[in-house]
Amino acid sequence: MNRRRFLTLGAVASGTLAVGGLSRMGSGPVAAQISAPPTVDRLVLTNVVDNLYDVFARGGRLDTVTVERTPLGKTPLLAEHGLAYHIDSSRGGERRQILLDFSLTDWSLFNNYRALGIDPYAADALVLSHGHMDHYGALPALATAGQGKWKPGVTVYAGGEDTFCHRVVVTPATTIDQGQLDRPALEAKGLKVHLVSQPAVISGQAFTSGQIARLTDFEKPPAAARLRAGDAGSACSATHFGLVKVETKPGDLVADNFQGEHATAFLVKDRGLVIITSCGHAGVINSVRQVQKATGIDKVHAVVGGFHLAPAPDEVVAKTVAAFKAINPDYILPAHCTGINTIMAVHRELPSKLIMPSTGTRVVFGA
């Protein structure tokens, strides 16, 4: 068994699956573009919290990427239905640290920061992918604990006003209240909040996708996702929810199009784009294409994060994998809400590209 296959099969073999020179694009209009996307020499991506923790997963060197696993220690890592990343990038002598998403509970996030030796208050910026509680859940507690500890002017970057709207999940069996992130409370605790609906550079080394264009015909927002309408004219009124143009009363539930969801990305020198979808409600392929358009760069080194395909029918999974083949990233690192169905499809169709992350996994891209 070659080294690549050894790493790819690590989590599968142990019985655990994580559910974790450049060319320019020359076609298609770009609504907004980063004129000179920053390049990093090295990028270290740590899954601080993910849906599973696989103590037996294998690590090692895989071509241009190093995969490091966290063994059992005195402070065991906690996994939950949530996602949080610590991102450490460098260019020359400049280092930047970014916190991306904040899991569901503060006890898992704080425990894992401690176990992994991460100081969250050393972060240069915070990025929130969207307004679901399994991504923002621990942010209020982190903001409270960080008063007086953050770097001056540290900012939370969100993709749109709907990040701070009340969300609900409605299924035939139950209704789940996702709650609402309190923006004024974050600001009162010393965090600035900045909305980036257009592609934007973060801390000089990262960048966000901006609002994600819906290009594919097979990627649709989850049917169960709802937003609770706010007062007319407010940031959470139904007319602000993207494709929704309906008359509603405050308190009504309307379809959630995830207008404010955004992806986070890096351009690794001589490798290409590393694109982190977080949850992928807008579509993992749409997210990748959005970053390609925003940067004008075609080459994708890695696609990382939750792809939100666990509940997807086989046809959608097959079309997603076919689109991955066309994009041809060097690596695919599915996490969080991707689903075993999609992980196995990638393993079957693109085995040489699959790396299985879980809670505590560190992946080093570049030098």
What is each residue range found by the language model?
Residues N51-D54, G59-L116, N257, E261-I276:
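Conserved beta-strand hairpin/beta-sheet module of binuclear metal-dependent hydrolase folds
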Residues V201-F266:
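Active-site-proximal loop/helix segment associated with metal-binding centers of metalloenzymes
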Residues V44-V49, I98-D101, A206-I212, L273-C279:
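Active-site-proximal beta-strand elements of phosphoester/diester hydrolases
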Residues A125, H132-Y136, T155, F241-T361:
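Cap/insert and terminal regions of metallo-dependent hydrolase folds
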Residues M1, G21-V44:
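C-terminal segment of N-terminal export signals and the immediately downstream linker at the start
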Residues D106-Y157, T295-V304:
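Active-site metal-binding motif and surrounding structural segment of the metallo-beta-lactamase
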Residues M1-S14:
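N-terminal secretory signal peptides and thylakoid transit peptides that target proteins
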